[in-house]
């Protein structure tokens, strides 16, 4: 097995087998830093004889969107390639995006989180570093769906859709044919309708989502100042006496639903993938299950 360990912006000590290749990259790797990964994939599989993405999409059935499956390229590999990412969920998202765009998701993928991680919870990874490293190096592959958006970004642990200003959302969010959010913003600062959070599942259909009833994150994390505007009018002043800003990240458990795709539309939406916000607002976004599954190494 060819083993590449990508250590992202960290000097954490790693006990690795002698055959491992260690890549030290930025906390959020650049495309240039990941070229060695592209080269390793090309050596492991110089030619992919399996159906292309276009050919899979043209298939009349949807078998490829059922239970996640082992990569069909496995029997054709010169040597299996295992990639282990040591870093944050955001770092893993960048590596996944690179693998997805270059179409070598057949590579085995392990993850060793260096801080609190939604990915680790989703995949059932150990909470201590040494155990997580051991799993990443030696555990078998258990495929999971890969969720991406229409901007070509892969989601490692979670994503959110909210108002660009971080206030209540104006817009609509739909999971398959189920409406999770349909709302026009008001001036509330407490519990309200702020958007939705979604996480990839480890099985079909692929996406779990729920309505956000408080800001998806603290305004400071988006480079926004906290809202210090004084309430306008007697009604707004009266409401302010009986409400307070809601703690970020609260979800409405009664709205939890699953599906293969999430679509959203609104005047100024903020899209956040694994804690990293898009640089500018959009008026529509779609998250959906990719045609190839992730070959995840997990317990």
Question: Over which residues does each language-model region extend?
Answer:
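Catalytic core of DAGKc-family lipid kinases
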Residues: 4-9, 17, 28-36, 42-79, ...
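Gly/Ser/Thr-rich loops at beta-strand to alpha-helix junctions
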Residues: 10-12, 84-93, 114-118
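Extended, charged low-complexity segments
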Residues: 249-299
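Short, acidic Gly/Pro/Ser/Thr-rich loop/turn segments
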Residues: 11-13, 163, 294-296
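Feature detects long, helix-prone N-terminal segments enriched in hydrophobes
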Residues: 24, 82, 89-90, 96-98
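Short, aromatic/basic amphipathic alpha-helical patches
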Residues: 13-21
